[in-house]
């Protein structure tokens, strides 16, 4: 009969260029709302690529926090009337305070031109820069949607702050990577210049010690 079997992922509606935002409603995939929701979902995926190479548990936790907020934002765009999908103003405050913290360090260590570094200083910063480009594109889609459909002000502010946070995070990752490289380069030099340990000759009547567990380990 051409209908999908129960339990399958596909419905066939998308074959005609349509998709569902709410149960029972279908809109064109070219609709501004679909573009904005898709942009938020792309941003979640891009941040997942950053998280794959993140070894710092604290920063990994921040990425999960942002991904979770973006999913709430996407759901809110799909179902704006329900009022169920909202996030606290603390999420915006978190981005602002963490951005200020990183910018403060970068300004102190790199000077006022810290933003000018090219992407690619390390893998994590490159992925952060790519994620920032995705977020900025999603923000533009959100603004395009707002011209036709009302978008909550907090959503627009959040996407704008998120782009700033990712810029600061990318340059911060570059700085941390360079600090680690400098530290690694200094360590061999320190080892070479360290004074050699004095060798004390054993007494003539010393008895050789066999390979016990203590002196093997």
Label every PLM stretch briefly:
Residues 1-217:
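Phosphate/pyrophosphate-binding loop motifs in nucleotide- or prenyl diphosphate-using proteins
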């Amino acid at each position: 009969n051409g209908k999908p079997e129960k339990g399958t992922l596909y419905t066939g509606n998308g074959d005609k260029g349509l998709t569902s935002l709410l149960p029972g409603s279908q809109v064109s995939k070219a609709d501004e709302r679909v573009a904005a929701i898709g942009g938020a979902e792309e941003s979640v995926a891009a941040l997942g690529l950053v998280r794959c190479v993140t070894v710092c548990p604290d920063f990994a936790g921040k990425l999960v926090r942002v991904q979770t907020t973006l999913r709430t934002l996407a759901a809110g765009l799909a179902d704006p009337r329900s009022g169920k999908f909202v996030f606290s103003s603390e999420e915006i405050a978190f981005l602002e305070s963490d951005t200020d913290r990183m910018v403060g360090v970068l300004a102190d260590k790199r000077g006022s031109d810290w933003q000018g570094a090219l992407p690619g200083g390390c893998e994590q910063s490159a992925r952060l820069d790519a994620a920032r480009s995705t977020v900025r594109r999603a923000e533009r889609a959100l603004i395009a949607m707002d011209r036709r459909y009302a978008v909550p002000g907090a959503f627009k502010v959040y996407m704008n702050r998120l782009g700033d946070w990712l810029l600061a995070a990318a340059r911060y990752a570059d700085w941390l990577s360079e600090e680690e490289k400098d530290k690694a380069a200094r360590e061999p030099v320190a080892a070479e210049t360290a004074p050699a340990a004095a060798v004390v000759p054993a007494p003539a009547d010393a008895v050789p010690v066999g390979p016990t567990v203590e002196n093997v380990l």
